[in-house]
């Protein structure tokens, strides 16, 4: 009688993960696009800028969407020299000042109210540019959006939703017009 020997050399390994959850993260980003036209209609400068969304702006977004709260009117303004910070509020932004009213350069009228198109592909954009008609000479360093506050320049009411800085400060003179669009995107 013969004996067959069997030697097992194959190995099997398996790993099982339990309690795994899909990751679903969301971030909000925005872009301003500012174009300065001379009194003759020529482009003096053209700058797209990434903005930051402030902490109070993110909180307002959550409260509005999930808390059944009304956001309020949206207005846009211009900022002077100094960097925006996520901790900035409309009442307290120590790194910069709003321009247009007390701080030069001045522009005519109140803070303009942008119109927005319907959201699509996780983005919401202005349907047309808002215009700032400059009435004096000075330096502009960026843009901001206020929600639920006053359209009056230098008002500290409402929520500072976002602010963005140009790559460098921009000079303007009386007769210049700054046209600004904005797009917010959720990723």
Positions of predicted regions on the chain:
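Small cysteine-rich, disulfide-bonded extracellular modules of the LU/uPAR three-finger superfamily
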Residues: 1-142, 147-187
């Amino acid at each position: 009688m013969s004996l067959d020997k069997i030697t097992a050399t194959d190995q099997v390994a398996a790993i099982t993960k339990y309690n795994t959850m899909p990751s679903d993260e969301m971030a909000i980003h925005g872009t301003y696009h500012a174009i300065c036209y001379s009194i003759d209609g020529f482009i003096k400068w053209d700058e797209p800028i990434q903005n930051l969304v402030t902490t109070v702006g993110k909180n307002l977004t959550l409260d509005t969407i999930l808390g059944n709260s009304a956001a309020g009117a949206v207005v846009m303004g211009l900022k002077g020299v100094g960097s925006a910070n996520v901790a900035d509020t409309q009442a307290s932004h120590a790194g910069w000042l709003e321009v247009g009213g007390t701080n030069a350069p001045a522009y005519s009228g109140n803070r303009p109210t942008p119109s927005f198109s319907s959201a699509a592909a996780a983005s919401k954009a202005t349907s047309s540019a808002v215009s700032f008609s400059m009435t004096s000479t000075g330096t502009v360093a960026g843009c901001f959006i206020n929600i639920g506050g006053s359209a009056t320049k230098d008002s500290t009411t409402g929520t500072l939703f976002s602010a963005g800085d140009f790559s460098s400060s921009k000079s303007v003179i009386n007769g210049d017009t700054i046209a600004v669009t904005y797009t917010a995107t959720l990723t």
